[in-house]
A protein has these predicted regions:
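Charge-rich, low-complexity N-terminal segments
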Residues: 1-47
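Short glycine-rich, low-complexity/disordered patches
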Residues: 28-32, 138-147
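Amphipathic, interaction-prone secondary-structure segments
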Residues: 31-80
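Well-ordered alpha/beta subsegment
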Residues: 108-131, 136-144
């Protein structure tokens, strides 16, 4: 079965549109947990889910992803882990934290370094992710005391 794809033009439109959170606040996940909330774009049919997962063993490892609800396509991901290694389709190795941005050709398989990301800066990294996904009305995020 072929994977669901969208055109690059449509992906760019969805990535670049302004979005608003449908919830006013969320709790950042504790170790080994995830949390998810929805955001809406310019039109009500443009619905997205943002998921935040935090590692169980390494609490400095966490992932954030934004996907289209109607087809499950991941448009944007941020993987935060200083020892992470991702291999791009051309064989290039990306070490450390990195971004995935949807492309028509590769889906989410291509990564590029997240040079502006510091592992311990949970608040700033979450804001960077929401800004990159153009969420102009984000929820208030409550962080666990250990962060």
């Amino acid at each position: 079965m072929a994977a669901v794809k969208i055109s690059q033009k449509e992906a760019d439109r969805l990535l670049n549109m302004l979005k608003h959170s449908l919830v006013s606040e969320i709790n950042f996940p504790s170790k080994g947990d995830s949390t998810e909330f929805n955001v809406v774009g310019d039109q009500k049919q443009d619905l997205f889910a943002i998921n935040i997962f935090r590692g169980k063993i390494n609490s400095l490892k966490y992932n954030m992803g934004a996907r289209i609800i109607k087809n499950g396509i991941l448009l944007l991901e941020l993987h935060i882990n200083p020892s992470n290694i991702h291999i791009n389709p051309d064989g290039e190795k990306i070490t450390g934290s990195h971004w995935h941005l949807y492309s028509e050709e590769y889906g989410r398989l291509w990564a590029f370094p997240a040079e502006d990301i510091q592992n311990e800066q949970f608040t700033e990294n979450t804001i960077s992710f929401l800004n990159k996904f153009n969420v102009i009305d984000p929820p208030v995020i409550h962080y666990p005391p250990e962060l």
